[in-house]
């Protein structure tokens, strides 16, 4: 077994060796050991791939929409990814610092990436003909990466499954759900017996009406009978406590340390490959990983390989940048737990033993103020280089770092305590935003759902967002501060990069006064300006490519007097 060469320090290497060994034995002996070993891995590669890559549209969902059903279902006859190299994929994952790989064995379109004996709609009947899953499973075993599969419960292609494309909106003429359920059991058993033991079987598509709680619970028990230490996600069934862990999608999950969870997110915008898709920056990728782990979760980061079988080179480069960062700072990620400080848009924390790693992602002020700890701080150091000054009182912990020592992506402060950090109850940080928790309103809310209400942009939680309906091109988002407040800085974080023109305004005697105009917002937008005093502030979106959605809208007061940090 080989291990990732990025973790060069003895401490980190020891952690990684223990984690990988736990999974490669060949799998942990018990279910609880399997869950703990998986939580320690922290970072995995998600792969959505199939014949649909020939069209560059979304897997499953574009069947019957952008691509006619008849054409979509014939794509496999032209699928010949001659440049596919399992070693290259797995090496990329390993050098990115990833510890497990999840492949779409079957998505909602029904196509199988292994030569299943229960259908003819599989990789063996393409011009390519090779068993992609076999090659990937073998490469993962060689490199110490845990091999896992994604398997869709719904199947819009299979005649026995009641619903069809587009998107499960049509009904098939002669469905037979009990027979389809047996097909599903046969295929998942086939995968475990031929490619296992697996780390995870990652289900999806459980939301549709044909799938019931009874089906889900039976499948879960059936698979645990085949492989007791198999980890299964919550989408196997219905209900808040289904499966072994939760799976927030395309968002950073809320801080949660009482049940395992994993954010699944795309490196670009589409799950399957799309030409010239918008890709996340190095900063956004690394900070996403840090925020997820700081919330006590894992990150399953998705790529969609091209039709020739390669992962797009620019995506490989981005993943390797993450690996380079983890080579330096992996000790703050692998084998840690989230907290004790709850994650915000500007800060995350992880801990192991008597050590807390404070990840400062954005300097909102000259210092960072944290809630007091019930344990003493023995020492403090700056892992990213330079000096740090920490002042602890009964009311707060204040951290100061000279500006030249602040890392543009993540300034990491290591705090050594006089006792274990694990027994410290999670601590919420005071918000730096004057808008946090204030009354909010908006011109449009996605499906009138409270889950996407305007308040989500002002909750200081990077995992929730205000969203608008599909097709909305103009919208506004307003906050009432309760009383006039002085602000000198606005910070915005947008999902999906849809805004093309906007203005920031404040209310003055019944009129809206514009104090800033801009075009794109993107993942991270900051505007500083001469202080203004107002009670009502709004973001007025004048032009967007589709329904705008905002993670965070923060209003900051003028900076306080600087906290002097001596070398």
Task: List the predicted regions and their residue ranges.
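Short beta-strands within extracellular/lumenal beta-sheet-rich domains
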Residues: 469-483
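Bacterial N-terminal signal peptides
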Residues: 12-22
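Short beta-strand edge segments in extracellular beta-sheet folds
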Residues: 554-556
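Mature catalytic domains of secreted/periplasmic carbohydrate-active enzymes
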Residues: 27-446, 491-494, 500, 506, ...
